[in-house]
């Protein structure tokens, strides 16, 4: 199996932007959100179960999942969030692990917004935290998702605190500043981490080979 770098951060931290920079360097990415989206695509068995449970109103006119509506429901009704997690998490975890095990590259970027909250750290060889201030999180997420600030604040409150998240970090990228003004610094940091991860992956591979030779 490839060396696994877990990438995480709070809502609005810019995880996708950073992951895209690694992808440009040829690093394969396993994205938990993308796995989740594909598992509940139009016509999927899991989406059918969600619609049966919550009612047809949880679907758009085109038959796709209305994510904004679902988000509002589960944040106002914890028991419904628990039901949804019990349905989705086993399928998501199974597919994520399948994709991770299939990678042949030296290392893979494992992008999981709730890596710490869902206690998935043990799947990773190293953890990269994308760090921003709570104020930046709120401003970015509200603008990006066109959601009410109150809902974004609820999501932030449901995630681990910035301080606790940072205690799990092996590496940190501060992404507080606007990428348009700060892109060169971020790209350089990503390149440095990329080289480090290649070295760490090689060390792990060599250790594994040496054990097998004994």
Curated annotation (Swiss-Prot):
This is Dephospho-CoA kinase. It catalyses: 3'-dephospho-CoA + ATP = ADP + CoA + H(+). It is found in: Cytoplasm. ATP binds at residues 12-17. Belongs to the CoaE family. Coiled coil: none annotated. GO terms for molecular function: ATP binding; dephospho-CoA kinase activity. Gene3D superfamilies: P-loop containing nucleotide triphosphate hydrolases. Pathway: Cofactor biosynthesis; coenzyme A biosynthesis; CoA from (R)-pantothenate: step 5/5. SUPFAM superfamilies: P-loop containing nucleoside triphosphate hydrolases. The keyword Transferase applies. Its main location: cytoplasm. Catalyzes the phosphorylation of the 3'-hydroxyl group of dephosphocoenzyme A to form coenzyme A. GO terms for biological process: coenzyme A biosynthetic process. Keywords: ATP-binding, Coenzyme A biosynthesis, Cytoplasm, Kinase, Nucleotide-binding, Transferase. One of its GO terms (cellular component) is cytoplasm. Residues 4-204 form the DPCK domain.
């Amino acid at each position: 199996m490839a060396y696994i770098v877990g990438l995480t951060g709070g809502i609005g931290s810019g995880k996708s932007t950073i992951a895209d920079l690694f992808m440009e360097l040829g690093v394969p990415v396993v994205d938990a959100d993308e796995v989740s989206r594909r598992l509940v695509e139009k016509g999927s068995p899991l989406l059918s179960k969600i619609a049966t449970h919550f009612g047809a109103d949880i679907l758009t006119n085109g038959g796709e999942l209305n994510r904004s509506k679902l988000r509002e429901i589960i944040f106002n009704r914890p028991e419904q969030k628990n039901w949804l997690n019990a349905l989705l998490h086993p399928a998501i975890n199974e597919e994520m692990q399948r994709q991770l095990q299939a990678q042949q590259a030296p290392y893979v970027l494992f992008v999981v917004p709730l890596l710490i909250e869902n206690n998935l750290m043990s799947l990773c060889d190293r953890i990269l935290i994308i760090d921003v201030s709570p104020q930046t999180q709120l401003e970015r997420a509200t603008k990006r998702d066109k959601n009410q600030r109150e809902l974004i604040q609820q999501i932030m409150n449901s995630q681990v605190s910035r301080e606790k998240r940072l205690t799990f970090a092996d590496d940190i990228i501060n992404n507080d500043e606007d990428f348009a003004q700060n892109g060169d610094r971020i790209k350089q940091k990503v390149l440095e981490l990329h080289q480090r991860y290649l070295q760490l992956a090689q060390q792990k591979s060599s250790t594994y080979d040496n054990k097998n030779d004994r």
